Amino acid sequence: MFLALREIVTARGRFFLIGGVVALITLLLVMLSGLTQGLSKQNTSALEALGEQTPYVTFSTEDPSFTESEIFAEDVPASGIPLGTSQTKLEGHGGVAVFGLPEGTQIPGSSTVIPEEGMVLSQSIDDALNAPSRGTLGGVDLDVNAVVEDEYYSHSPVVWVSTATWQKVSHSPEDMVGVAV
């Protein structure tokens, strides 16, 4: 112990240099963990907001693929709520994630429900477009029914629509009600 204290006193510069490097590495790790948490939150916050129920998906082919998944009305259990997701463009804004839920389903974190026709925008989209009353989502003209708190999916703000509207926007068959996520 005496030798260590004597070394610190005689070689102060080296001691502070090594201590500074350790402190900077610690700071780097803290900042990187915060960055990765933020990125992961923006990737899946809309899915996490839907609830804590664990989804179970069974694929019927040998090569399962989430991107090519299709869930039809007869595949949804009585207690299940089908969720359709897709990525498309909202005219004047750019890329958005579209979440299709059955009409009347409550949007997470809000008292707003999914309208029969039209769309519900995330706050950041509404701010960027200066509160529009209509918009073209994936080539389909829709009214803006409400604005809710921001949720994100795949780093894109979410637009909430009914299953029927989601089918039009994502160009899906009429009997397809969702995808595996």
Regions found by a protein language model. Give the residues of each.
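Short N-terminal helix-initiation segments at or just after the protein's N-terminus
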Residues: M1-L5, T61, S122-A128
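Single, functionally critical "micro-switch" positions that shape active/binding sites
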Residues: T10, L24, I81-L83, L121
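Basic-flanked hydrophobic alpha-helices used for secretion and membrane insertion
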Residues: E52, Q87-V181
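A short alpha-helix capping/helix-coil boundary motif
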Residues: V21-L24, P55-Y56, S172-E174
